């Protein structure tokens, strides 16, 4: 059970006052970084700005308290924007809350069932494809506010967005665009000045001051969303129906997989920064609890945020106390300073997310894979990317995983091979080769199987043939790591064929997994235990005795 025990309980032994001070300072700095991102991501997701802070506070607390990483910072991330926007557009806020809670439950189950290590089986091509797809979708989704387009709403579909922008291109607000460009410029230049204060916060303060004091005609959070709620989030159980639960299962599963991938990736990155090892299953449970309570308190899906976690480490955070401090700081900001957030220009928040989208897309890896990866990997990469952009993340991940699995099985089936040994007097054997070969009678045929024998390659077993003078067939299996039920079916068919011809099947060097499957299947008893040998020499000696 130690692997499910929250990391907080482990690191508090010998906790010093000096580290407490460092954790508090790191938590406050991370809260300042998280503030503009949480608000911007909530708005981009189609919900109110307060819900972004609710998520960072509630989910962030549970992720830090119950998670398996010392330094993980949880909250809303750009990866969820696309899927949240689609859920809200189709099913409303109740649908989003149900999906968030279901995703949390799935994550908790994944953690309890020790699925933490299974996330590594999600192919790199899929994560690269959907990450770049999310970046493109997120980038395009900000153009309305960045240019100040006079549109009542933005369609959820990618192509519909482009068409809608084209129809309203004449409504561009030049002032809003200039303010947005100023915000982008500040975020690009500020890191060269100092990395202690995030450029996004500086951009928000500067552009908000310009718009407010110059009384510019630019949409702000207050003009779009009205007065902001500065009270602590209230516990709320949504109206749940079985139909809504069924509708939300698929997006909830996608949210859970995304949260697991991003949080564990963040945990691995932070491990390298602090020289620690996270508990992946405890982390999944912490992520699950964070999402369950985020939904119940009106928040949106959350996960570990790589950038905020890295900032926590760089500023001295070394225990979950830093993450909890980040939540407390955001709570104080929510209760005291939230009315000031109404003054923030919408174009500035759009600019923040444009920069986030540009930074999250790993185009270098994307194009490198397109140039150098095997054709099957390129197919998965490109398919996942375009499905994310033109359909949605749910479809992209589901089809991407299935496609990757099918192409992987095809590749494995192509590597599986069965070769017949040659006789020393074969016409195509050179004298040098003949010296290396064992001289065996023509009444014995030897076949060597290479590669895993599973359903995609099982039919190759039936390629093992015999001549009219064959009395024994030796099958060497030292290069077969695994077999499945389909391969066993083919072996049974081969055995029946051999019996009809009075041919003895002899097996050599059967590895542990194939031997276990054969034993469980009853195949060893059927063929005869005496026909299984540890090595090819013993198998050939036995075969020669039989055919004398």
Show the residue positions of the predicted features.
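Transmembrane helical cores of multi-pass ion-transport proteins
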Residues: 1-426, 490
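Conserved SAM-binding loop
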Residues: 73, 507, 532
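The feature marks cytosolic C-terminal regulatory regions of anion transporters and related permeases
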Residues: 359-526, 544-548
């Amino acid at each position: 059970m130690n692997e499910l025990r929250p990391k907080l309980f482990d690191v508090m032994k010998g906790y010093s006052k000096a580290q407490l001070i460092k954790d508090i300072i790191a938590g406050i700095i991370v809260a300042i970084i998280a503030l503009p991102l949480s608000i911007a991501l909530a708005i981009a997701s189609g919900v109110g700005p307060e819900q972004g802070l609710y998520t960072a506070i509630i989910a962030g607390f549970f992720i830090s308290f119950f998670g398996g990483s010392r330094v993980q910072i949880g909250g809303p991330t750009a990866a969820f924007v696309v899927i949240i926007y689609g859920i809200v557009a189709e099913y409303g806020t109740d649908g989003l809350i149900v999906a968030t809670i279901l995703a949390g439950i799935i994550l908790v189950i994944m953690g309890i069932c020790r699925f933490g290590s299974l996330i590594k089986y999600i192919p790199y091509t899929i994560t690269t494809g959907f990450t770049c797809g999310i970046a493109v979708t997120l980038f395009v989704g900000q153009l309305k506010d960045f240019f100040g387009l006079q549109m009542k709403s933005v369609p959820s579909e990618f192509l519909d967005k482009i068409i809608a922008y084209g129809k309203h291109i004449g409504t561009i607000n030049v002032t809003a665009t200039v303010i947005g460009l100023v915000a982008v410029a500040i975020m690009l230049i500020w890191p060269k000045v100092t990395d202690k204060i995030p450029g996004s916060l500086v951009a928000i303060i500067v552009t908000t001051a310009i718009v407010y004091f110059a009384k510019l005609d630019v949409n702000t959070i207050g003009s779009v969303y009205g007065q902001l709620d500065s009270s602590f989030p209230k516990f709320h159980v949504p109206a749940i129906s079985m139909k809504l639960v069924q509708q939300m299962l698929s997006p909830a599963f996608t949210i859970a997989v995304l949260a697991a991938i991003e949080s564990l990736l963040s945990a691995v990155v932070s491990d390298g920064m602090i020289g620690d090892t996270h508990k992946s299953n405890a982390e999944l449970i912490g992520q699950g609890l964070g999402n369950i309570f985020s939904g119940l308190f009106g928040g949106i899906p959350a996960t570990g945020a790589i950038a905020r976690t890295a900032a926590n480490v760089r500023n001295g955070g070394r225990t979950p106390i830093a993450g909890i401090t980040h939540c407390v700081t955001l709570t104080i900001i929510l209760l005291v300073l939230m009315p000031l957030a109404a003054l923030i220009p919408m174009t500035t928040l759009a600019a923040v997310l444009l920069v986030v989208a540009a930074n999250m897309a790993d185009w270098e890896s994307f194009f490198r894979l397109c140039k150098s990866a095997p054709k099957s990997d390129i197919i998965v990469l490109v398919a996942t990317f375009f499905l994310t952009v033109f359909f949605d993340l749910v479809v992209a991940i589901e089809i991407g995983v299935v496609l990757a699995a099918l192409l992987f099985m095809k590749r494995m089936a192509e590597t599986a091979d069965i070769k017949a040994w040659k006789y020393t007097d074969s016409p195509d054997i050179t004298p040098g080769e003949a010296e290396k070969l064992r001289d065996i009678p023509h009444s014995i045929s030897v076949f060597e199987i290479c590669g895993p024998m599973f359903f995609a390659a099982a039919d190759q077993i039936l390629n093992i043939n015999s001549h009219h003078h064959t009395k024994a067939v030796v099958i060497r299996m030292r290069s077969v790591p695994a077999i499945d039920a389909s391969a066993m079916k083919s072996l049974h068919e081969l055995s029946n064929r051999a019996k009809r011809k009075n041919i003895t099947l002899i097996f050599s060097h059967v590895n542990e997994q194939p031997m276990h499957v054969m034993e469980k299947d009853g195949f060893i008893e059927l063929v005869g235990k005496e026909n299984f040998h540890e090595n090819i020499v013993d198998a050939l000696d036995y075969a020669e005795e039989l055919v004398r």
